[in-house]
Amino acid sequence: DRTTNFDLYKKIFEYVGIPTTLYKDENIVNENELYLIKNLINLIIKIKNKEYDTSFKYSFVSVARSYLSDFNDDDIFNIFLNNKFMDNEIFIKCNEIVKSIDSMSNQEILENIVDKFDVINKFISVGNIDNKTMIIDYLYKTFGDLDSIGYGIEDVSDYLDNIISKDKQIKINMTDTNGNTVKIMTIHKSKGLE
């Protein structure tokens, strides 16, 4: 990949006080947002099918420990110890989606997840809001494409599992173009700016 050293160049330029913008595609497969959406979808499917197995618990803990929830380790431990998975905001929000899941498209399910878990506003707590929003937009478009070829929510879950487990790359352009900066890009990216 010709963009391997771009981050180093950016650090050097910014060290000497020169603002820079990187023009490169980022692989989103290892981003938290992809995992969170995948785990929320898994929770919804498991609740719909009333399967409270190890996979359900794994997905629950993933969401509970994320910036989308306010659970600390003691809360999670008590939920496990007392088997109180159904008495918390994560389960309640997912169950609300389950109630109307059969009449929703994959895009509508994602929209409900983003809305009920206040995903966009929670980005503020972790920063990099624009890039995280681009990931959600990419997923929204992808879910629409999967809707158009007849994929159900279980198929979407399998699709996301496949991407993550096979370590495939999904690259999207996450360029931050703020102001008057030095632009670092490959020759191929520069051709589009002529």
Identify the function of each model-found stretch.
Residues 1-58, 99, 108, 113, ...:
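Conserved motor-region signature of P-loop NTPase helicases/translocases
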Residues 57-103, 107-108:
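Polynucleotide-recognition surfaces of large bacterial nucleic-acid defense/processing enzymes
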